[in-house]
C-alpha cells in the first residue's frame, strides 16, 4: 500500500517580500546557486531571511551531497510554496535544510516525521505488545537456557540509526528492563536536545553527505574537524555562521504561519570582517584556515607598539617623534628608513616614560650656486659669463659661427660642432689631401707627413678648421689654440 504524499506548509506565505520575490522570479535575482549541473537564480535578501549561509550574493555552488531536486524543493519552501514529498524524499530534504541552516524547514520535517511515528505499523505494534507479560522470577528466566531471543530493534534518534541487539528479553518489571528503558529514553532525549541546540551547520556522527558547510562533531577540537572536511575549505562566511551559537529564545517554535524568520536577520554577524566574529572556541581553527589572512597581534607592550611605530616613522604625527629637519635628501631618507627604524620605534614606545635623546641633525645642504650674470633684456641669470653672452645672441640675432661646407650659421660653437656631423666629416680637414681629423693635435701630426714646400703661402694650422667666427675669441674660450706652423 503506497503512503500518501507529505504536505509541508510554508510559514512565509504572508510575507510581502517573499511574495514579491516569488512573483518576480527569476527577474531581479542577484544570486545564482549551482547545485550539481543546474543553476538556481534567487534573491539574496529572501535567502538571508531564512538562513545566514544562503544569504550570499553572487554566484556560488553548494557542496556535494545535495541533489538538484532536493535543493529545488528547499528553494520552493523558502519562497512560500507548500512542498509535497514522497516518503523517501523527507530525510534528504531534512539533511539539506540542516546543512544550509534553514531551521524552519528542518523543524517542519521533524514534525512530519513525528506525525508518521505516531502511527506505527500493526506488525510492529503486535511485536511491542508481546514482551509485556510479567515474570515473577526474572533471575530464573535470565538463566534459563531455553529463553527466547528477540530480533534486532532499530531506533532512529535525531537522524542517527542505532542498532540495539537484545539477546535477552527480560520482563518490563525487572530491574534490567527498567534500566535499559530509562537509558534508551535518556539517550533519545539527549540526542534530540543536542539536535535542537546544535549550531547551524554542525553535522552528526552519521553524516553521509560531504556538504562543505558542515562541521563534524569531533572531541579533538575545531582544528581536527576542519582537517577532516571533504573537499576544499569553505569560505569565511560559511564557517562563521556554523560556529555562531544561537540564543535559547531562537530555538523556541514561535515561528507560526504568517511570521517571517526575523531572528536570522537580527542575529546575522558581519560577513566581511574578522573571521568567526565573537565566537571564542575557534581560535585554533581560524589560525589553521586563514593563516595568510591573519593580523599578527602580540600581548606584550614593546612588541605591540612595533607596528604602530612603523606607521609613525613613515607618517609621523606632531609630538610622536623628535622633530627633525623639514626636508631630507634622498640619501638621508633611505638611511632613515633602513637604519633608524628600530631606534625610532624604541623612542616612540618609551616616549611617555623617559625622554629619548634627540637624533643628531644632518649637515646643512650646500648653498645654491650663485648666478651673478643677468641678461639685460629678459633678466635670466647665469653662473658663467660666456653662458650669458651666448644667451644674449638670442635677442640680438647674431650668429658668428659659420660652416665652411654650407651656408649654415650658428650662435653657439657647440651647436656648430653638432652641425658638422650632418656632413659626415671631422672638424679639421687637410688643405692638401682633404683628410679629416677629429682634433687639432691629430691634424698637426697629419701635417708633418706633408712637405712644407707644398703648403701655400700664409698657411696656418687654424686654416684647417672648417668653422670660422666673425668675432674674435678669447684665448680661454677659443676652440683651438694657435700653434706654430709645422716644418
UniProtKB/Swiss-Prot annotation:
The C-terminal zinc finger domain functions as a transcriptional transactivator. PANTHER family: ZINC FINGER AND BTB DOMAIN-CONTAINING, ZINC FINGER AND BTB DOMAIN-CONTAINING PROTEIN 32. It holds the Pfam family zf-met. Residues 357-369 have a biased composition (Pro residues). This is Zinc finger and BTB domain-containing protein 32. Homodimer (via PTB domain). Interacts with the N-terminal of FANCC. Interacts with ZBTB16. Interacts with GATA3. The gene is ZBTB32. Residues 112-166 have a biased composition (Basic and acidic residues).
